[in-house]
């Protein structure tokens, strides 16, 4: 291991502590990523089709992300039906950015390790 790898490892652990560890699950990461990409938001059924997991699993993860202030649940009336869709908040974008930066450090570390 060289000096650069030591610095990257140190930074990986420092950045990891900046991430809300309860948010960093694959499902929550994918939800935040999808909602950051689809800026107009997505409905529950659209998220379910993308993730292919149970309604309960999606619902509990959406509820958690809503309570944390990372996403908003919005209502829209269409043909006398109330439709709900989810959008990412600024806090959600910031948390996603922290996760992506942390993952980029790990990728950099793996690249350094493979180059030896």
What are these regions (language model features)?
Residues 33, 66, 97:
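A cross-family signal for key residues in well-ordered alpha-helices
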Residues 78-99:
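Basic, amphipathic "hinge/linker" alpha-helix immediately C-terminal to the N-terminal HTH DNA-binding motif
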Residues 11-13, 72-76, 87:
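Contiguous, function-dense segments enriched for cysteine-driven chemistry
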Residues 44-75, 80-82:
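Canonical helix-turn-helix DNA-binding module
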Residues 14-57, 85:
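N-terminal helix-turn-helix DNA-binding core of bacterial DNA-binding proteins
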């Amino acid at each position: 291991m060289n000096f650069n790898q030591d610095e990257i490892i140190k930074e990986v652990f420092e950045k990891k502590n900046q991430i809300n560890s309860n948010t960093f699950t694959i499902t929550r990461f994918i939800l935040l990523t999808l909602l950051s990409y689809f800026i107009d938001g997505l409905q529950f059924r659209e998220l379910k089709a993308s993730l292919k997991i149970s309604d309960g699993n999606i619902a509990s993860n959406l509820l958690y992300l809503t309570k944390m202030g990372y996403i908003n649940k919005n209502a829209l009336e269409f043909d006398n039906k109330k439709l709900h869709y989810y959008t990412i908040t600024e806090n959600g974008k910031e948390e996603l950015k922290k996760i992506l930066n942390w993952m980029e450090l790990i990728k950099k570390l793996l690249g350094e390790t493979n180059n030896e």
